[in-house]
Design a protein with these regions (language model features):
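Bacterial N-terminal signal peptides
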Residues: 9-18
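Contiguous segments within soluble domain cores/interaction surfaces
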Residues: 25-139, 169-301, 309-311, 317, ...
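Short, structured interface segments
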Residues: 138-147
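Acidic, serine/threonine- and glycine-rich low-complexity intrinsically disordered segments
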Residues: 148-164, 171, 179
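Bacterial N-terminal signal peptides that target proteins for export
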Residues: 1-10
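Sec/Tat signal peptide C-region and signal peptidase I cleavage site
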Residues: 19-24
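Extracellular interdomain linker/stem segments of modular secreted and single-pass surface proteins
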Residues: 146-154, 316-322
């Protein structure tokens, strides 16, 4: 009986140790930051030396979370369903320690023109990393994209097959991101970086946009984070930073419809917390702190007097964003919180409002995510 108990204990120990070891190994492997993967179609003004027909090749950029071992080489493979492998190319790679990341981009003109295709439809791809020193070849990310085409703005008989190709990114529109940003004048390991962080969020639009967005923050049904000087608002949120933009490489007819942009907005008068000796009072009023006002919040985004977006979130008593678990469950690969975005009005033109269900993150839809 005692021997049986010892054997059972040993088996349980080995099982638990195995789980911990596997988890530790997984943590020491490179991963892809999913929201950094951006794939576009690069249009060539030629197809198999025929300038009356245009073709395309892929361009991709992404960020890899370390460690990336010495001797590693990132590469990407694209496959057309029913036709097998299409193009494979290397991406610039550098050895990177754990806790740091490496951003790279590749494809486009690095691919020979004779590899261009006129195919439009679903395309599969895989981001891989080989290391001949270690004898390994691992898949880091697999995805699929929808490629479509639209006629260029050129006219005449020779322009009949001048099509411009693009990747459909409608799935992005209902997906938003909340995040805090450190004060970057301090070293990476200096705790002062996070003593007074900035509050930002990001969201997507489709189409050409000018004179862009105004962000408004609400808590308990009232707008907060406003400061004024002599009757004029000071320190209004800035939404002019473009994080990502997908645009066609040639002009199209119709124009301006095939542009997807991820904008970053930063609230300069709203802070998650303030652990510095700096005073909360400014010449224009008191800074608004999440740590003093926990609870539910809503961001409303206006454009030219019209409401175009709404997203909701919560903060705790320390001023931290309440994690809804979506980014963690889907292994986003960074510290951003994913939130659903309500798309309001016709600012973005016609778009596929259900694409997020199947196409999000290139065929890797979010678990636990729903759109209001």
């Amino acid at each position: 009986m005692r021997r049986q108990l010892i054997v059972k204990f040993a088996l349980v120990f080995m099982f638990l140790f195995g789980i911990q070891t596997a988890a530790a190994v997984e943590e020491d492997q490179p991963t892809i930051a999913k929201d950094s993967v951006q794939v576009t179609a690069f249009t060539f003004s030629v197809y198999r030396k025929n300038y009356d027909t245009w073709s395309w090749v892929p361009k991709i950029e992404y960020r890899v979370n370390g460690p990336i071992a010495s001797g590693s080489r990132l590469y990407v493979e694209f496959t057309i369903p029913g036709s097998g492998p299409w193009v494979k190319f290397d991406c610039q790679t550098e050895a990177t320690q754990k806790g740091f990341s490496w951003k790279t981009e590749c494809g486009a003109r690095e691919i020979p023109e004779d590899k261009g295709t006129t195919y439009a439809g679903p395309v599969n791809f895989a981001i891989r990393m080989r290391n001949e020193l270690a004898g390994t070849d691992a898949t880091l990310f697999t995805g699929k994209m929808k490629v479509a085409k639209v006629h260029s703005n050129e006219e005449g008989p020779k322009a009949a097959n001048h099509f411009v190709y693009y990747v459909d990114h409608d799935w992005n529109l209902p997906i938003g991101y909340l995040f805090y940003e450190p004060e970057k004048q301090w070293d990476l390991d200096d705790p002062r970086r996070w003593a007074k962080p900035k509050f930002s969020f990001a969201f997507w639009t489709r189409g050409e946009t000018s004179g862009f967005a105004e962000a408004h923050l609400f808590h308990g049904g009232k707008e907060v984070g406003k400061m004024y000087y002599e009757g004029k608002e000071m320190g209004a949120p800035s939404c002019g930073t473009t994080e990502v933009q997908h645009n066609t490489t040639q002009s199209t007819t119709p124009a301006g419809q095939f542009i997807w942009t991820r904008w970053k907005c930063t609230f300069t008068s709203v802070l998650p917390w303030n652990k510095t000796a700096d005073k909360y009072e400014t010449l224009f009023g008191r800074l608004y702190l999440f740590s003093e006002n926990p609870g539910d919040y809503e961001i409303k985004v206006m454009h030219q007097g019209h409401l175009i977006r709404s997203l909701k979130f919560a903060v705790d008593a320390e001023g931290k964003l309440v994690d809804n678990g979506i980014a963690t469950a889907n292994k986003l690969g960074n510290d951003r919180v994913i939130v659903p975005v309500q798309v309001i009005g016709d600012q973005d033109g016609q778009w596929d409002r259900t694409a997020w269900k199947t196409d999000a993150f290139y065929g890797n839809p979010l678990k636990g995510f729903s759109v209001p």
